[in-house]
Amino acid sequence: CLVGSEMCIRDRAETEDEVQNTDTEKQPAQQSVPLVDKIELCAPVAGTVKALSDVPDKTFADKVLGDGAAIVPSEGKVYAPADGTVANIMDSKHGIMFVTESGAEILIHIGLDTVNLNGKYFKSHVSDGDKVKKGKLLVEFDMDAIKKEGYDLITPVVVTNISDYIKAVCMEKEDAAVNAGDKFLTIV
């Protein structure tokens, strides 16, 4: 995974099982099957890393929706964390459901209770079903206006189908600064 202006690349390992036969007959090798060792997600927004348990909303803090981490944004732009598909942009544009090419389902939730803004201060650059490359601008939001309305901008990034995996590991220490595109979460 590259950091800075380069975007993360998901690691993929290929395996090939070969049938060993002690007889003189040759057995054909089984077909190669790609296996995903891990899925690396880039930070979808620039800011300060926070543990999911520190999000002041029990649904996220108690990992009811899944596992991940959060970012307190320093910039009002959200980017695709990997190559994949925009499954759903919520009508209020504060939440994005994203599915990576390998099937990890990611919720990027901009702020807490920002659904109540009904899309005010948010601008979507994609639509449901769009296939995008990592780093594609998904949503812009007016940080100052949202803060003035009294909303917390902490942005949980949650793997909602974490039960399909072992765990999600944040690659940055809590309170570390990240740029959009930096290595952020690894799903194993």
Predicted regions and their residues:
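Single conserved hydrophobic/aromatic residue that forms the stacking wall/gate
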Residues: 1-4, 8-11
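Contiguous, well-folded functional domains in the mature portion of proteins
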Residues: 14-188
